Amino acid sequence: MQPLQSAGYDRAITVFSPDGRLFQVEYAREAVKRGTTSLGVKSKEGIVLVVDKRPTSKLVEPKSIEKIFQIDEHIGAATSGLVADARAIIEKARLEAQINRITYNEPIRVESLAKKICDMKQMYTQHGGVRPFGTALIIGGVNGRGCRLFETDPSGALIEYKATAIGAGRPAAMEEFEKKYSDDMNLNQAIELALDAVYEATEGKTTPESVEIAVIEAADKKYRRLPDDEIRDHVEELLIRKEKEEEE
């Protein structure tokens, strides 16, 4: 990408630069790139969401850091970027999910919710007096059309993925996904792959306390956050596996 040389075109959100760029949107993307790494993986048995939530200080309570959110009983989201912006979008998403249940007496489809979130993000790139949301979301869930995984960025763009990552560790994580992803993975293999990607994205600084994992299984279409003991087991398996790889 070209250097962000604004020449004054970043003073208003609604003004394009001569080469067709909205600098405030690009600045919002930079906020996401500086955020902690979040990942999503789709398998034949469900969706896996994993985030790196290493505290910035030893005085921070790890449990107070929240980067994965339940939106509805069958949908979850992982975020990167400005936490307060992400929280505002999550609250809006939860409201849309409940409105759909009340109006149509059925759970909202994953793609419909993702599009509604992107519509809101796009509106904040088009009006004066507001700024773009400095956060990206990975939205995963299971509905009648199977397992779905979407990524939204600050511009309101929406892309569906088999596996994706956002945040500072995205390049390393995506490289790991490109090498190891398979359509035939079960849920445990998807968790293994996601943790491999987090390990690469954090340069090996992965511990049981530094990651958070949530799954939405295709069998029951229910969001579930993994308890600490399950996360510890998965991370210990990861570290043993990496030790063996280094020895070889």
Swiss-Prot record:
The Gene Ontology CC terms held by the record are: cytoplasm; proteasome core complex, alpha-subunit complex
* One GO-annotated biological process of the protein: proteasomal protein catabolic process
Arranged from A to Z, the UniProt key words for this protein are: Cytoplasm, Proteasome
One Pfam annotation, family name? Proteasome_A_N
Q: Can you name one GO molecular function term for this protein?
A: threonine-type endopeptidase activity
The known regulators of its activity are described as: The formation of the proteasomal ATPase PAN-20S proteasome complex, via the docking of the C-termini of PAN into the intersubunit pockets in the alpha-rings, triggers opening of the gate for substrate entry. Interconversion between the open-gate and close-gate conformations leads to a dynamic regulation of the 20S proteasome proteolysis activity.
Which compartment or compartments is the protein found in? Cytoplasm
Q: Which InterPro entries match?
A: Ntn_hydrolases_N, Proteasome_alpha, Proteasome_alpha-type, Proteasome_asu_arc, Proteasome_asu_N, Proteasome_sua/b
Predominant location of this chain?
cytoplasm
The record's annotation in NCBIfam families points to: arc_protsome_A (TIGR03633), PRK03996.1 (NF003075)
How this chain assembles, per its entry, is: The 20S proteasome core is composed of 14 alpha and 14 beta subunits that assemble into four stacked heptameric rings, resulting in a barrel-shaped structure. The two inner rings, each composed of seven catalytic beta subunits, are sandwiched by two outer rings, each composed of seven alpha subunits. The catalytic chamber with the active sites is on the inside of the barrel. Has a gated structure, the ends of the cylinder being occluded by the N-termini of the alpha-subunits. Is capped at one or both ends by the proteasome regulatory ATPase, PAN.
PANTHER family noted in UniProt = PROTEASOME SUBUNIT ALPHA/BETA (PTHR11599)
Function, in words: Component of the proteasome core, a large protease complex with broad specificity involved in protein degradation.
Q: What is this protein called?
A: Proteasome subunit alpha
Give the organism the record lists.
Methanothermobacter thermautotrophicus (strain ATCC 29096 / DSM 1053 / JCM 10044 / NBRC 100330 / Delta H) (Methanobacterium thermoautotrophicum)
